[in-house]
Regions:
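Zn-dependent metallo-beta-lactamase
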Residues: 1-30
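Active-site metal-binding motif and surrounding structural segment of the metallo-beta-lactamase
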Residues: 29, 40-87
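Active-site neighborhood of phospho(di)ester-bond hydrolases with catalytic His/Asp-centered motifs
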Residues: 34-36, 59-66, 87-89, 148-151, ...
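Metallo-beta-lactamase
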Residues: 88-210
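Short helix-loop-beta junction
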Residues: 248-262, 338-341
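Helix-loop-strand module that forms the ligand-binding subsite of alpha/beta enzymes
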Residues: 267-343
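Conserved small/polar residues in nucleotide/adenosyl-binding loops
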Residues: 361-368
Length: 370
């Protein structure tokens, strides 16, 4: 269900088109509820659940992920249906007591990799997905309708009735929520390759039913930290606007060569989108001024985000500005040299206060390909 009133997802990511919290019900001889929803939509979720159940009662609640945006209503639904069993893995139940004050000892169904749960015509097979993006995460494959319940995998920002391309907000969601855990996503993709999947049901965003190879290929690219497109992100952090003017001029010159260029003002634009574009393209230009002998904080914050999300396999060039002792490039370079497989482009462009004819960007326009 949609939440269009939320301002920040995880209290940090802007979601102008809201977000959805997806919960599913499998109706069969036995009934399984697949996850709950955020506390923000509790009343609506229970109303939808009761409508789906009619005069029947659920047999199982399957807990794919304990994060509160999906699990906030576990205790309430368990109390509403006292005969319902709770399905999770060992890590699920180890963590559950940290969130809820309810004794589920006699109601637990503990599952592991490859275990099956028959509902009648439908059968769930459990696929462990640790650290995608919490340690207890698991997915479920339903073999009759060939559905993968993918937890946070293949999710995106945006309400379900938002008319927008899947890729952009799915990419922003992936790199900012799951991006650090590429190896773990790769492991799950290998498991999924052995399944006959016709539908993917994530916990956020639309159900995917067509051209599934497109979405899986995107996840394979993203989780292997390979560039999705050839292009350059010019990211700037400017105090009084002079560094930004230089960065904008550079972006214009790069575009004139036929290169795809994205631009972000780190002082004003969405940080999550800057992270997204950094991973999308194969090259990055960092433009920042020196501040109190260090890096201007918006740029330093950006580099912290890239480090946290395991940014790698890219080329990076540097533009620095300083009125008396420019050191930003040296310090930015010291940070990114700690990233995996990064090529630092030389020479550094140094600006003293304002741009003038002595500053050359020629070296940054070449090579036009990674």
């Amino acid at each position: 269900m949609d939440d269009k009133d939320i301002d920040l997802f995880e209290s940090q990511y802007v979601v102008p088109n809201g977000v959805s919290y997806n919960s599913y019900v499998i109706m069969d001889d036995k009934i399984a509820i697949m996850d709950t929803a955020d506390a923000r939509v509790t009343d609506k979720w229970f109303a939808n659940l009761r409508e789906a159940l009619g005069d029947r009662k659920p047999d199982y609640l399957v807990v794919s992920h304990l994060e509160p945006d999906h699990a906030s209503n576990i205790q309430k639904v368990a109390e509403a249906y006292p005969d319902m069993q709770i399905v999770g893995n060992a890590k699920t139940f180890n963590m559950m007591g940290q969130f809820f004050d309810i004794d589920l000892t006699d109601r637990k169904v503990v599952v592991a990799e490859g275990d099956k749960l028959s509902l009648g015509k439908h059968e769930l097979t459990f696929v462990m997905a640790p650290m995608v993006h919490w340690p207890e995460v698991m997915m479920e494959y339903e073999s009759t309708d060939k559905v993968l319940f993918s937890a946070d995998g293949f999710g995106k920002f945006g309400a379900l009735d938002t008319d927008e391309d899947w890729t952009c907000e799915a990419r922003r969601y992936y790199f900012n929520i799951v991006g650090k855990y590429g190896a773990q996503v790769q492991a799950v993709l290998k498991k999924a390759a052995g399944l006959d999947i016709e539908k993917i049901c994530p916990l956020h965003g639309p159900i995917l039913t067509e051209n599934l190879g497109f979405y899986i290929d995107k996840y394979n690219t993203w989780s292997s930290y390979q560039p999705e497109d050839e292009g350059i992100l010019v990211a700037c952090a400017s105090i009084h606007g002079n560094t930004k003017k230089a960065a904008e001029l550079l972006a214009e010159k790069l575009k004139a060569t036929g290169v795809k260029v994205a631009f972000t003002d780190l002082c004003r634009d969405d940080m999550a989108e800057a992270v997204e574009d950094s991973f999308r393209y194969d090259r990055l230009v960092l433009c920042a001024c020196t501040y109190d002998g260090g890096i201007f904080p918006p740029m330093e914050d950006f580099l912290h985000h890239l480090k946290a999300k395991a940014y790698q396999n890219r080329k990076i060039a540097f533009v620095e500005n300083g009125s008396w002792a420019p050191t930003a490039a040296r310090q930015m370079k010291a940070i990114v040299e700690g990233f995996k497989n990064i090529e630092c482009v030389e020479p550094v462009v140094t600006i003293k206060s304002t741009l003038n004819k002595a500053v050359s960007y020629t070296h940054l326009t070449l090579p036009t390909k990674a």
